[in-house]
């Protein structure tokens, strides 16, 4: 009897110990997951020949989880806890570990802007953007809209895999300004014959990880886009994002990016990223009277201005509406680049950019207006 009681006591004690240990392990696991964040881990150029498996091992050995390895950037998107971040920063093969920041669409809320930048002058000459491919790196495009001709695309938003569904309406609006069809309905885009590609990197709330944007730019490079429109941005720089933007430009793509909607703050630049990078054309917004919109970001990085107040364009569901923002100004520049390339298909992206900037109409202090309002008629001469 005593032996039986002893056995029961031992069994109870073991059960209690196991339960406590399991609870402690669960608590540790919960504690670990709560501190995990999304990062981009960059590897040193001397390690460029390192295999994908080896790079994954470097991160995994530190407790990280690799989400995606990039094609043109020697880096990987990963989920890491604080300990893994510290250990990776010490690893001799790692160049940097940076947070995978979140970018947001730059919008606040007829196309008078089409006339304001002199696009109809090129239309009348027969140049409408034919044979020019424009990647709209945004929230997707409603491909069923009767005023849009979407030729292809891809989604890099894990939870929203259809690039032709636009939950925020932002990308569809941007697409219409670039290339709404000349079909007697709705609105007219800057380059109505340009080929639109929906590259989805923002979710239905208008937000997206930098790693999603990097994937989108890499897709544009691999698919030989001529123009990239990025009506998005964030307040924080990223080595990986700059690397892929620079790669896009060195690949011959014209890259237009929204300067941001942060307004002015004395002599401090409020231009966001990726527009802040020198390789992009940073676009600010003016109204129909060529006055800088109060929300338009300012700074020495600002390159040109375009209409961005009460811009009427396409919306999901076959509808239309007016939005404000440097997001709305940027597609005027992307569309203008498409018009120029349709007239001068042998021009390089550097030539297109130089013409857009050198022929812009002076509006005032470059800190607030860059080179001025684009004039695509003059730029295409």
Curated annotation (Swiss-Prot):
It is found in: Secreted. The gene is aprN. Its cofactor is Ca(2+). One of its GO terms (cellular component) is extracellular region. SUPFAM superfamilies: Protease propeptides/inhibitors (SSF54897), Subtilisin-like (SSF52743). Monomer. The active site is at residues 138, 170, 327. CDD domains: Peptidases_S8_Subtilisin_subset. Residues 111-380 form the Peptidase S8 domain. It comes from the Bacteria. It catalyses: Hydrolysis of proteins with broad specificity for peptide bonds, and a preference for a large uncharged residue in P1. Hydrolyzes peptide amides. This is Subtilisin NAT. Subtilisin is an extracellular alkaline serine protease, it catalyzes the hydrolysis of proteins and peptide amides. Subtilisin NAT also has fibrinolytic activity.
């Amino acid at each position: 009897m005593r032996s039986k009681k002893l056995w029961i006591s031992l069994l109870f004690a073991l059960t209690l110990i196991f339960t406590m240990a399991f609870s402690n392990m669960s608590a540790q696991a919960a504690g670990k997951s709560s501190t995990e964040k999304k990062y981009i881990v960059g590897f040193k150029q001397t390690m460029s020949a390192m295999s994908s498996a080896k790079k994954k091992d470097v991160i995994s050995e530190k407790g990280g989880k690799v989400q995606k390895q990039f094609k043109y950037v020697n880096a990987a998107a990963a989920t890491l806890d604080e300990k893994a971040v510290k250990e990776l920063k010490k690893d001799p093969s790692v160049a940097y570990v940076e947070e995978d920041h979140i970018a947001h669409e730059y919008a606040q809320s007829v196309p008078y802007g089409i006339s304001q930048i002199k696009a109809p002058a090129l239309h009348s000459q027969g140049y409408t953007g034919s044979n020019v491919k424009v990647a709209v790196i945004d929230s997707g495009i409603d491909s069923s809209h009767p005023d849009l001709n979407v030729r292809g695309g891809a989604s890099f938003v894990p939870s929203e895999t259809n690039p032709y569904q636009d939950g925020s309406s932002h990308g569809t609006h941007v697409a219409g300004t670039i290339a709404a069809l000349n079909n007697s309905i709705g609105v007219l885009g800057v380059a109505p014959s340009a080929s639109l590609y929906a590259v989805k990197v923002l979710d239905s709330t208008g937000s997206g990880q930098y790693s999603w944007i990097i994937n989108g730019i890499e897709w544009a490079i691999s698919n030989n886009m001529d123009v990239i429109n990025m009506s998005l941005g964030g307040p924080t720089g990223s080595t990986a994002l700059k690397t892929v933007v620079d790669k896009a430009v060195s690949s011959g793509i014209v890259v237009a990016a929204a300067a941001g909607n942060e307004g002015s703050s004395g002599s401090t630049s409020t231009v966001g990223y990726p527009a802040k990078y020198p390789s992009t054309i940073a676009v600010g917004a003016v109204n129909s009277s060529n006055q800088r919109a109060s929300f338009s970001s300012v700074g020495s990085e600002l390159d040109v201005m375009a209409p961005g107040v009460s811009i009427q364009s396409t919306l999901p569901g076959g509808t239309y509406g007016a939005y404000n923002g440097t997001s709305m100004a940027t597609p005027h520049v992307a569309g203008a680049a498409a018009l120029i390339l349709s007239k001068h298909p042998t021009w390089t992206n550097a030539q297109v950019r130089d013409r857009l900037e050198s022929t812009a109409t002076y509006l005032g202090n470059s800190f607030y207006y860059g080179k001025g309002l684009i004039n695509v008629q003059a730029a295409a001469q």
